[in-house]
Amino acid sequence: MEKDLHLHEKKCLAHEAATQVTSGMILGLGSGSTAKEFIFALAHRIQTESLAVHAIASSQNSYALAKQLAIPLLNPEKFSSLDLTVDGADEVDPQLRMIKGGGGAIFREKILLRAAKRSIILVDESKLVPVLGKFRVPLEISRFGRSAIIEEIRHLGYEGEWRLQDTGDLFITDSSNYIYDIFSPNSYPNPEKDLLKLIQIHGVIEVGFVIEKVEVWSSNSQGLISKKYSV
């Protein structure tokens, strides 16, 4: 029942976000279950309104779904800016700082967020938290020298574990890297400091803290949408 409720919230958010798309836009498609609903809503508008847009997908899963739904896709090596990126998040604090990357696509997701003139993050209200840290923070790690990289991370006081596939093998991202999920018993009241320390480690390719200028749209169980804007 709770799963169905969250799905309803995601669909409401996705359809509202799709109304922000106009012909001629180049869009960034996020990853995860909420971004998936946005891709469906976008495809519906393209099919019913002859909307002319192009998109860049942040993951192979989003790419495959967009292609299946006949959303025109661009070469990810060729774009320089985006009009709008729509994605989800794992946690959002009152300052709209986020933890993202639960699906393992944080490196590509951040590229799309930073390239976009406007970014909309869609979450159900359960993702709004007073302080970040209940959700583990994914680090995208180089496969080369991974054990040495983890030693540096632990030296800074962070504990974690390698993300695994269902087979028990190490999870490999679409960019052919590993994911190391860190956790903190004290949460992250100052994620900017944690982000700066971690990203300076050579071999840490990306960190799942997101501190960008974004709009966060949240929905409650009644389908009411609240919009907040970072400054």
Swiss-Prot record:
InterPro entries: NagB/RpiA_transferase-like, Ribose-5P_isomerase, Ribose5P_isomerase_typA_subgr, Ribose5P_isomerase_type_A. The gene is rpiA. Keywords: Isomerase. Substrate binds at residues 31-34, 87-90, 100-103, 127. Pfam families: Rib_5-P_isom_A. One of its GO terms (molecular function) is ribose-5-phosphate isomerase activity. This is Ribose-5-phosphate isomerase A. The keyword Isomerase applies. Gene3D superfamilies: 3.30.70.260, 3.40.50.1360. Belongs to the ribose 5-phosphate isomerase family. It comes from Chlamydia pneumoniae (Chlamydophila pneumoniae). GO terms for biological process: pentose-phosphate shunt, non-oxidative branch. The active site is at residue 109. It comes from the Bacteria. It catalyses: aldehydo-D-ribose 5-phosphate = D-ribulose 5-phosphate. Its EC number is 5.3.1.6. Catalyzes the reversible conversion of ribose-5-phosphate to ribulose 5-phosphate. Homodimer. Pathway: Carbohydrate degradation; pentose phosphate pathway; D-ribose 5-phosphate from D-ribulose 5-phosphate (non-oxidative stage): step 1/1. The keyword Isomerase applies.
